[in-house]
Swiss-Prot record:
KW Membrane (keyword) present: yes
Listed Gene3D superfamilies: F1F0 ATP synthase subunit C (1.20.20.10)
Name by which UniProt lists this protein: ATP synthase subunit c
Recorded name of the encoding gene: atpE
Keywords in alphabetical order: ATP synthesis, Cell membrane, CF(0), Hydrogen ion transport, Ion transport, Lipid-binding, Membrane, Transmembrane, Transmembrane helix, Transport
Topological type in the membrane: Multi-pass membrane protein
Length: 70
């Protein structure tokens, strides 16, 4: 039962991160289309945001492995 719970938790975290990444990237592209001169700044900020969003599923996978090793 622990394996199922851990895999569901990791899957939900990955799903949430993919939705979040899509929203961040789409808004960044909208901003680049409106202000092309800010493209470099927006791109750098986007990479930082995507990195922070991706930290959540990575941590959930680590927690899932910790739960499975009990």
């Amino acid at each position: 039962m622990q394996f199922i719970a851990a895999s569901i938790a990791a899957g939900i975290a990955a799903f949430g991160a993919s939705i979040g990444n899509g929203m961040v990237i789409s808004k960044t592209l909208e901003g680049m289309a409106r202000q092309p001169e800010m493209a470099g700044t927006l791109r750098g900020t986007m990479f930082i945001g995507v990195g922070l969003i991706e930290a959540v599923p990575i941590l959930s996978v680590v927690v899932a492995f910790m739960l499975m090793s009990r």
